[in-house]
């Protein structure tokens, strides 16, 4: 479905401006219901992750509640520089859709397996059994969190 030829795929690996252009290229392929943040916010997330990685000098563990375009930014960062990400979203269909998009676009071009980087949990992040507190049991500590699920607080 998202099988395409990106013009400068060899430059994406260098983590240059081309990485950001590629991120926006893939983001704009998403339907509106999966693309809820502006391009500038998506790029900002990607840049913050790059800065954080350089500062901490390690592969990052990323966490998000809700999924969508932010997932693309976080996944691209992990695909380029290493790392793991965890996403909680009660909409399992959305997670499945995003996994397909990521696999067909970013995964195919960068030759990475989405399942080795991204852990999608189709439950409420506050669930006592499978919510965010599971990371403690896994002895994982998040380096960056993006909370973008319920907008009713």
Label each PLM-derived region with a short phrase:
Residues 1-145, 150-153:
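A short alpha-helical cap/connector motif
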